[in-house]
């Protein structure tokens, strides 16, 4: 089943399951870009001895179980299958017609309930107001976070920032005491969230929209110097400010008890594959040959703009090689126009079917090629439909002629390349 927003189906399924979501203590995150990063910062900082910190983020990067973690470790496959089979049986016997995402969301809630998580960090799948994760009662949400909002999924959420913001702000429901929003959002976005918070008596904290020497100031722990943390890209500073605003609220209200040193050390060890992620990609399982690449899941205009800022800072005007696949239905111009220059080369490819998301597939590379040529972004375009062949072909270019390689356009592309990489390492 494709994307179908609404809370009626999942509400009924959870009732048959005993409403596990009503026993969870939740931090709920919405936004267009940066949600997964904020969730990872939160779950990493909250981890303490004897604590179980659940995290639910989508889409998964490598395996579907990556979406559901406790202390950043995926749900065991057997446990996932057992819960999933029970849910599928309930879904069928009661003719509920739940979507794949609703079944996955229920799997996460049931798992977190069973292991008695102290905190559950929950990322919205799409939008917010009618997203399956919003079945969680407002009284169970200790805090909500709103990351940068941009144009994406317009056919579901609306064609303007204000319309999209209203959907995202829908996670702020009655009983939510505190909300944090990324201060770099457009004024009309912040106004929508501010009005929502005022109507529902949720106190709003707007993060600092300026870099200010890469510092984060908190009431609980004082200042943090972000220069000491492994953050790639300006936008990660603003994502971290959302997470820190939420954590600061929890600390002030004695919902957590974490020292400044603990916060710093846990942030220093955060890894987020697929977001400005540098790796030596193993392209050949026989020779163990590797190729340095930069991988980023940028898949919309605002994410592409942030990626370009990083690329110009790192590489200046140096020509780049892009390896790209794009999910079918995505707007091409907002994604490609900021990225490509006439000096750049692009290799267009595909990703395979995505586990648990049968409606997702890649845009035909020929369609993307025609668009790029029509727009005149670059004439250096190649198509390689077999993803596993793309990077080996680049490895045979001499180091003198080799350009920096940037893999982007879709998290599904990043995930599939990581699967190939991991299988080569195992072999």
Residue ranges and their predicted role:
Residues 25-29, 37-54:
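A conserved segment at the C-terminal end of the G1
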Residues 119-124, 132-145, 150-153, 163, ...:
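Nucleotide phosphate-binding/pyrophosphate-handling subdomain across enzymes
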Residues 59, 179-185, 194-214, 230-233, ...:
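Beta-strand->loop->alpha-helix junctions that form or flank phosphate-binding loops
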Residues 107-114, 245-252, 419:
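Short glycine/serine- and small hydrophobic-enriched flexible loop segments
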Residues 127-201, 332-334:
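Conserved catalytic-core segment of NTP-binding enzymes
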Residues 3, 7, 12-23, 47-139, ...:
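ATP-dependent carboxylate-amine ligase catalytic core
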Residues 410:
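Active-site-proximal loop/hinge segments that shape catalytic or ion-binding/gating pockets
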Residues 183-204, 288-294, 336-404:
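C-terminal helical cap/extension that packs against the catalytic core
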